[in-house]
Amino acid sequence: MADRADKAARSSVDPGEIARFSAMAAEWWDPAGKFRPLHKFNPTRLSYIRERTSAHFGLDARAVRPFEDLRFLDIGCGGGLLSEPMARLGAAMVSADASEQNIKTASVHAAEQGLGIDYRCTTAEALAAAGETFDVILNMEVIEHVADPMAFLKDCASMLRPGGLMFIATLNRTLKAHAFAIVGAEYVLGWLPRGTHDWKKFITVNEMETGIADAGLRLKELTGVSYNPLTDKWSLSRDTDVNYMALAERARD
């Protein structure tokens, strides 16, 4: 009980980050708007989640609704760009974000699509303190925006059921990432509003590996995600210098 109380009292929320994304909430579902990079990135991460989750739980990735028996958490869900496809694949979705505006936008859009997603304006530590548990946790492009990344990672990991999976996507704290993700994407190409990212809050691969182990999980896989300007598409790669995804699991009992 004391551990849950500590989690409830702690906050992963960075007010500046919440204000920044709340101001853009209405644009989540505009593929040509401020979240265009996420719309472009989405097919790659969706395919990765579908394939790895199906393989891990012995499911048929080609099935229409392969995730029907799984409970998912999309933490830092934003406007629901990941939550909606997962719901269509049958997952019982709990989608959380600390921005009330994001949750309102996501809820309205899901209702328009006829999707039953449990959207909540809350935090990882509050969900953990309430004793929530999940088979799969999607921790995508959020850890670099929280106040205490390693505490946030532990809170998320504490909600993972035995044998469960957590997907983590973030940016590496390298000079290359600063050049591509901040100077290039925000200042030169204008793909993202200036100030979207703070390079000092990026997570190195070594920090991620240590954080996953400290949270009681095992790292199954780590892969880079690279952008090809000639095709205007993202794909998995060996290059983890800028964008990368980590796949972690909790041991089965």
Swiss-Prot record:
It holds the Pfam family Methyltransf_11. It catalyses: a 3-demethylubiquinol + S-adenosyl-L-methionine = a ubiquinol + S-adenosyl-L-homocysteine + H(+); a 3-(all-trans-polyprenyl)benzene-1,2-diol + S-adenosyl-L-methionine = a 2-methoxy-6-(all-trans-polyprenyl)phenol + S-adenosyl-L-homocysteine + H(+). Its EC number is 2.1.1.222, 2.1.1.64. Keywords: Methyltransferase, S-adenosyl-L-methionine, Transferase, Ubiquinone biosynthesis. It comes from the Bacteria. It is an enzyme of class 2 (transferase). One of its GO terms (molecular function) is 2-polyprenyl-6-hydroxyphenol methylase activity. One of its GO terms (biological process) is methylation. S-adenosyl-L-methionine binds at R45, G76, D97, M140. Pathway: Cofactor biosynthesis; ubiquinone biosynthesis. O-methyltransferase that catalyzes the 2 O-methylation steps in the ubiquinone biosynthetic pathway. Belongs to the methyltransferase superfamily. UbiG/COQ3 family. This is Ubiquinone biosynthesis O-methyltransferase. It comes from Parvibaculum lavamentivorans (strain DS-1 / DSM 13023 / NCIMB 13966).
